[in-house]
């Protein structure tokens, strides 16, 4: 066993070790900063110069080397911390493993040193869509109940920053991407063990990175591995149930289902418009505990089907750590959705304009389309190797027309739609798309930006894409 494998605490002897961090960003810097604090000699390797990080790394005593990944096969260090953007199947990573160099992710490193201030339960959340909303919902429910909560991970705040917070926390709510999960070990001291774990839903995504649907699903399934308390799964998504059934977990772990249906014993669901818990109350065999109503959720813009599903998942996770139902209800009353997620931008002359720019895969588009009856769909971007034709087959009657954006529109030949308008690449493709959608829309229609792909071919981010849509719609409304 290497010396690194035996390091299971902030207070273990890290002094004098050397580490290479591959990639820089918020998580890479958090790893560098943490390791320097632990007395580790740190060198960060990244293919581009980052002026801001250069100065920060210099300030903490870490070196920065501009280098591409394929130049690092012979790097000589005690262990490596890799960015979640680097595949574990990358030939360079395989070569480094062959040299018996331990390879950690920021998440594994955080798990090993989680006791710096205090050790608290980790609530793990993943899913193709809705994981950020579910993490924020769960965090707000626990906080409303008086707990100190760190919502961290893929959501933006590195887990290592939460670990090092001097005040400590009662719970970590950790959002995990498939990239982060694929880097986690299944065994040994670095294997992360959540108290409660959930996969919100599952569908094809990031196939250009994972290589196959099965490998993407396998990465997602790791969220349940080693769970010590509760595995929360989606009753409306058979794949998540299979994951729980096949997971290697601690003894006496309970499986809790959630779904848009009347709940059975051990489930969270809906009865006559009331969200109910039949999983965590002692009299669950013959009664249910009321949490809130769909009517109340509607007042707070949380009543779309896919959002209610996220709410139910968060309810199950919050109840798994004995959160008071009244606290959950109050948190839901105050919760605001993140921007760019089925966000109503305008209602003008009988037409509703909805910004769902965060829908970066087909599953998210399907979830969004399920809420509307007649849609002009603005669609397109980087498709990440996923077949999108199923969307248009399934919603042929719902989609009145599709306005296609994005540089690569080759998928158009494979989709079936009543009307297709392709927007050529330009300096302002969104304004052109909004103008085209306006010509097609009639009273009763919803113009829905739900692109189904990443934004980077024409925009800086999904936020930038969504803001371009919002601005274009506002300009259109002003002119009318």
UniProtKB/Swiss-Prot annotation:
Cellular compartments per GO CC: cytoplasm
Pfam family, one: Mur_ligase_M
Record keywords, A-Z: ATP-binding, Cell cycle, Cell division, Cell shape, Cell wall biogenesis/degradation, Cytoplasm, Ligase, Nucleotide-binding, Peptidoglycan synthesis
Keyword hit for Acetylation: no
Catalysed reaction, written as an equation: UDP-N-acetyl-alpha-D-muramoyl-L-alanine + D-glutamate + ATP = UDP-N-acetyl-alpha-D-muramoyl-L-alanyl-D-glutamate + ADP + phosphate + H(+)
UniProt xrefs under InterPro entries: Folylpolyglutamate_synth_CS, Mur-like_cat_sf, Mur_ligase_C, Mur_ligase_C_dom_sf, Mur_ligase_cen, MurD
Pathway membership, UniProt: Cell wall biogenesis; peptidoglycan biosynthesis
SUPFAM superfamilies per the UniProt record, alphabetical: MurCD N-terminal domain, MurD-like peptide ligases, catalytic domain, MurD-like peptide ligases, peptide-binding domain
GO biological process: cell division; cell wall organization; peptidoglycan biosynthetic process; regulation of cell shape
Bilayer-spanning residue ranges: none
Presence of keyword Ligase: yes
Compartments where located: Cytoplasm
Enzyme Commission number, as recorded: 6.3.2.9
HAMAP family on file: MurD (MF_00639)
Physiological role: Cell wall formation. Catalyzes the addition of glutamate to the nucleotide precursor UDP-N-acetylmuramoyl-L-alanine (UMA).
Family in the record: Belongs to the MurCDEF family.
Name listed for the protein in its UniProt record: UDP-N-acetylmuramoylalanine--D-glutamate ligase
The gene coding this protein: murD
């Amino acid at each position: 066993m290497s010396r690194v494998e035996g390091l299971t605490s902030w207070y273990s002897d890290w002094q004098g070790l050397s580490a290479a961090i591959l990639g820089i960003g918020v998580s890479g810097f958090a790893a560098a900063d943490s390791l320097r604090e632990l007395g580790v000699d740190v060198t960060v390797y990244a293919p581009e110069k980052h002026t801001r990080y250069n100065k920060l790394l210099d300030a903490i005593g870490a070196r920065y080397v501009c280098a591409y990944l394929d130049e690092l096969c012979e790097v000589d260090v005690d262990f490596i911390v890799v960015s979640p953007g680097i595949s574990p199947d990358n030939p360079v990573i395989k070569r480094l493993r062959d040299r018996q160099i331990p390879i950690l992710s920021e998440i594994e490193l955080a798990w090993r040193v989680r006791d710096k201030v205090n050790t608290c339960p980790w609530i793990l959340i993943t899913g193709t869509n809705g994981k950020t909303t579910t993490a924020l919902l769960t965090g707000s429910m626990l906080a409303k109940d008086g707990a100190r909560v760190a919502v961290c991970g893929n959501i933006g705040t590195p887990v290592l920053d939460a670990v090092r917070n001097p005040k400590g926390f009662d719970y970590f709510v950790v959002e995990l991407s498939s990239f982060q999960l694929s880097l986690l070990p299944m065994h040994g001291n670095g294997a992360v063990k959540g108290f409660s774990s959930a996969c919100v839903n599952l569908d094809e995504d990031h196939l250009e990175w994972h290589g196959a649907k099965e490998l993407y699903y396998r990465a997602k399934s790791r969220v349940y591995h080693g769970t010590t308390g509760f595995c929360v799964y989606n009753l409306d998504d058979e794949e998540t149930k299979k994951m729980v059934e096949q997971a290697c977990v601690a003894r006496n772990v309970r499986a809790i289902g959630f779904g848009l249906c009347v709940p059975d014993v051990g489930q969270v669901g809906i009865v006559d418009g009331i969200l109910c818990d039949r999983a965590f109350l002692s009299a669950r065999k013959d009664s249910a505990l009321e949490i809130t109503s769909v009517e109340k959720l509607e007042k707070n813009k949380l009543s779309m089907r896919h959002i209610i599903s996220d709410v139910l998942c968060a309810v199950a996770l919050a109840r798994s750590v004995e959160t008071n139902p009244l606290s959950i209800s109050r948190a839901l009353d105050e919760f605001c959705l993140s921007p760019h997620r089925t966000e109503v931008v305008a209602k003008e002359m009988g037409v509703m304009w909805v910004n769902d720019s965060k829908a970066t895969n087909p599953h998210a588009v399907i979830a969004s389309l399920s809420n509307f009856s007649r849609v002009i769909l603005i669609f397109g971007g980087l498709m990440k190797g996923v077949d999108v034709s199923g969307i248009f087959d399934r919603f042929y009657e719902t989609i009145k027309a599709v306005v296609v954006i994005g540089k690569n529109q080759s998928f158009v030949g494979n989709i079936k739609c009543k009307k297709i308008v392709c927007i050529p690449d330009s300096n302002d493709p969104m304004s052109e798309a909004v103008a085209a959608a306006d010509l097609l829309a009639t009273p009763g229609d919803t113009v829905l930006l739900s692109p189904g792909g990443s934004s980077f071919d024409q925009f800086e981010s999904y936020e930038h894409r969504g803001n371009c849509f919002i601005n274009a719609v506002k300009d259109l409304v002003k002119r009318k």
